[in-house]
Amino acid sequence: MAKARTKFVCSACGADHAQWFGRCPKCHEYGSLQEEIVNAVSSGTNHRSLGAQKSRSSKVKTGQPQAALTFSQIRQENQGRFLSGYGELDRVLGGGIVPGALILIGGDPGIGKSTLLLQVAFQLATRLPRILYVSAEESGQQIKLRATRLGITQTVEPSQAQDGINNLAHDGNLFVLPETNLDDILRELEALQPQVAIIDSIQNLYFPALSSAPGSVSQVRECTGLLMQLAKRDHISLFIVGHVTKEGAIAGPKVLEHLVDTVLYFQGDRFASHRLLRSVKNRFGATQEIGIFEMVQSGLQEVLNPSQLFLGSREEFMSGTAITVACEGTRPLVVELQALVSPTSYASPRRSTTGVDYNRLLQVLAVLEKRLGVPLSKLDAYLSVAGGLEVEEPAVDLAMAIALVASFRDRVVDPTMIILGEIGLGGQIRPVSQLEIRLKEAAKLGFKKAIVPKGQTGIESAGIKLIPVGKVFAAIAVALPANENTTDQGNGSEAKIEEDLGKKD
């Protein structure tokens, strides 16, 4: 009788090792090796057929081998995308749910992943004949209780429900299966043939042919691979919920993200009600696209005008505040940057950021001190994005600089002005992408002026007065003019501004 052996699998890259290492020899990640017990194959087993045995045991029919085709011979089936019923989700997915797509969604515990997918399942059930919701974490009664609390359930008569399946949705189109055994889940998928299926969650499923525990690297990799085979073969769109680690990455091997077609992260601040659905990988649409939801008592609701969510009141504009337009994927968002510069009580001044890159703040502070002579090196500097949004693109550099100088001088920037531009180390203003889209979004909210990079010409201004600048000091002179009683900020040309400033470089 063959003995079971032990192997150590890296939770980061999925590599197998015969012995334990403190650091994975392949991906160099520390403390990532996990012990797994592997049942040895008996001497009478054909090693070459082991994979086929797994496929047969999981009821996934591999079919006949296919011959290679030329590109023109490939038949394109006329299968349109499914609309989820939520425009924000459809936007992130690139226009809807692609048949046969494998979509992975991750997020912190309690952020609302299951709530979002349950609401999506009910919406899809009003459009499609069969939707399957597989729960490995809740019973059918618990799911029904949650749906009732959210006010989205329309229960059918028990006599109309199929045996062994909790049927909750309108016209019986939504089927709920509380199960953790992958064999049973695959069997139900083949029998029911739903258009869309939801698996909650992949870390709680187990494949009986493997002896490792649910959630291990081998189990996650094998379960995802078999689900992918079935989804591609039968054109079933699959949503898979994934747990995240304490660092915020999806738990399991990186191969999990390589297998799926789309990777979505559901993000949010526990002190805020809004949630961001962000795509980091999408074979059928743009990456870094975001959808915005708000958590209310009845579940998640779409935010139709997200710029209003992240923009504070302009009636009481305070010093150190500047408005800019950030682009997340193809979506423009008008955001408010708030800066505070104050004397320090420590030997080393403090720098703190919320929603922007810390190193970006240090770079902007260095440019202001070196190129403009603004003495900020011995002052505390705090920078925050209102509303809890995280902005990573460099197009907000100029707004950061003006907000910092406005706080230093205790001055108020014109609340009808937006500020766009990337700052180079020499103090020059560099062009930004998608400028026309940003201006159109600002025009919708009533902004009248825009400080923009000087080199970007021939663009649609969308009714906004454009003030092109080439240097940081010119932009600050426009946003914070020397004459505080000036009513029309930004009438001067850059040449006149340079002359007034002594052509300081």
Curated annotation (Swiss-Prot):
<dbReference type="GO" id="GO:0008270">
    <property type="term" value="F:zinc ion binding"/>
</dbReference>
<comment type="similarity">
    <text>Belongs to the RecA family. RadA subfamily.</text>
</comment>
<protein>
    <recommendedName>
        <fullName>DNA repair protein RadA</fullName>
        <ecNumber>3.6.4.-</ecNumber>
    </recommendedName>
</protein>
<keyword id="KW-0346">Stress response</keyword>
<dbReference type="GO" id="GO:0005524">
    <property type="term" value="F:ATP binding"/>
</dbReference>
<feature type="binding site">
    <location>
        <begin position="107"/>
        <end position="114"/>
    </location>
    <ligand>
        <name>ATP</name>
    </ligand>
</feature>
<dbReference type="InterPro" id="IPR027417">
    <property type="entry name" value="P-loop_NTPase"/>
</dbReference>
<dbReference type="GO" id="GO:0000725">
    <property type="term" value="P:recombinational repair"/>
</dbReference>
<keyword id="KW-0067">ATP-binding</keyword>
<keyword id="KW-0479">Metal-binding</keyword>
<keyword id="KW-0862">Zinc</keyword>
<dbReference type="Pfam" id="PF13481">
    <property type="entry name" value="AAA_25"/>
</dbReference>
<dbReference type="InterPro" id="IPR004504">
    <property type="entry name" value="DNA_repair_RadA"/>
</dbReference>
<keyword id="KW-0863">Zinc-finger</keyword>
<dbReference type="InterPro" id="IPR003593">
    <property type="entry name" value="AAA+_ATPase"/>
</dbReference>
<feature type="short sequence motif" description="RadA KNRFG motif">
    <location>
        <begin position="281"/>
        <end position="285"/>
    </location>
</feature>
<dbReference type="Pfam" id="PF13541">
    <property type="entry name" value="ChlI"/>
</dbReference>
<dbReference type="GO" id="GO:0003684">
    <property type="term" value="F:damaged DNA binding"/>
</dbReference>
<dbReference type="GO" id="GO:0016887">
    <property type="term" value="F:ATP hydrolysis activity"/>
</dbReference>
<feature type="compositionally biased region" description="Basic and acidic residues">
    <location>
        <begin position="495"/>
        <end position="505"/>
    </location>
</feature>
<keyword id="KW-0238">DNA-binding</keyword>
<dbReference type="InterPro" id="IPR020588">
    <property type="entry name" value="RecA_ATP-bd"/>
</dbReference>
<keyword id="KW-0227">DNA damage</keyword>
<dbReference type="InterPro" id="IPR020568">
    <property type="entry name" value="Ribosomal_Su5_D2-typ_SF"/>
</dbReference>
<feature type="region of interest" description="Lon-protease-like">
    <location>
        <begin position="380"/>
        <end position="505"/>
    </location>
</feature>
<comment type="function">
    <text>DNA-dependent ATPase involved in processing of recombination intermediates, plays a role in repairing DNA breaks. Stimulates the branch migration of RecA-mediated strand transfer reactions, allowing the 3' invading strand to extend heteroduplex DNA faster. Binds ssDNA in the presence of ADP but not other nucleotides, has ATPase activity that is stimulated by ssDNA and various branched DNA structures, but inhibited by SSB. Does not have RecA's homology-searching function.</text>
</comment>
<keyword id="KW-0234">DNA repair</keyword>
<dbReference type="InterPro" id="IPR041166">
    <property type="entry name" value="Rubredoxin_2"/>
</dbReference>
<dbReference type="InterPro" id="IPR014721">
    <property type="entry name" value="Ribsml_uS5_D2-typ_fold_subgr"/>
</dbReference>
<keyword id="KW-0378">Hydrolase</keyword>
<dbReference type="GO" id="GO:0140664">
    <property type="term" value="F:ATP-dependent DNA damage sensor activity"/>
</dbReference>
<feature type="zinc finger region" description="C4-type">
    <location>
        <begin position="10"/>
        <end position="27"/>
    </location>
</feature>
<keyword id="KW-0547">Nucleotide-binding</keyword>
<dbReference type="Pfam" id="PF18073">
    <property type="entry name" value="Zn_ribbon_LapB"/>
</dbReference>
<feature type="region of interest" description="Disordered">
    <location>
        <begin position="485"/>
        <end position="505"/>
    </location>
</feature>
